[in-house]
Amino acid sequence: ISASIAEICWAFQISIVLSNFASGLAAHTTYKMALLIVPLAIVAECFSWACISIENRLYCTCEESIWTVIFLIAFLGHIYLYKRVGYENPPTSLGIGYFGYSIFLFLCIIAQLLQVVLYVTRYIEDTQNNVKYKGFIQGFELLHSCKTISKNIDDWGDDAAWMTGYFSICVWSSIWLTIPPRMPNTGSGLL
């Protein structure tokens, strides 16, 4: 549950940064797109919990696809606003340029697309192996009970690399977003 809350809060931070830039430049369409980010994140997390409970990777594919759309909205919005401000005087924060934040969002899109491919592949393998999925009630009952905790790398090694990178980037970018890049003459940049 805490990871879902953290991801929704992270989406909220991304939404705040984009909506603040958009409102500062009177970019109404971009502002409205920024407002879609948090509801999309909530829907994505619902798909995540559906995947976890019934173990159907198609739900994970939907979750990661929605996150891809979230990062695409943020990326395109920031590139549009960056071009609107001009290249001569881009806003900066903590020594990282606004354009750097857009590159970060682009890398998030690539990472999410890789996750979509991963889960589609797992779904296809499950389909080929005639995997029988749990029902929602059975899945939620299983979630309610404690599963066996494993320290065996064979059980979680396939996900270790992406999870380490993903959660490290999420934490550091969340810290960085507390003082986001700001537009000239629009305030302190604090959330």
Residue ranges of each PLM-predicted region?
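Internal transmembrane alpha-helix with an interfacial aromatic "cap," most often the third helix
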Residues: 2-34, 42-52, 77-85
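Small-residue hotspots
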Residues: 6, 67-68, 109
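Generic recognition of cysteine residues
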Residues: 9, 46, 51, 60-62, ...
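Intrinsic structural disorder
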Residues: 1-2, 153
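C-terminal transmembrane-bundle signature of multipass membrane proteins
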Residues: 75-191
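Short helix-loop boundary/capping segments
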Residues: 40-104
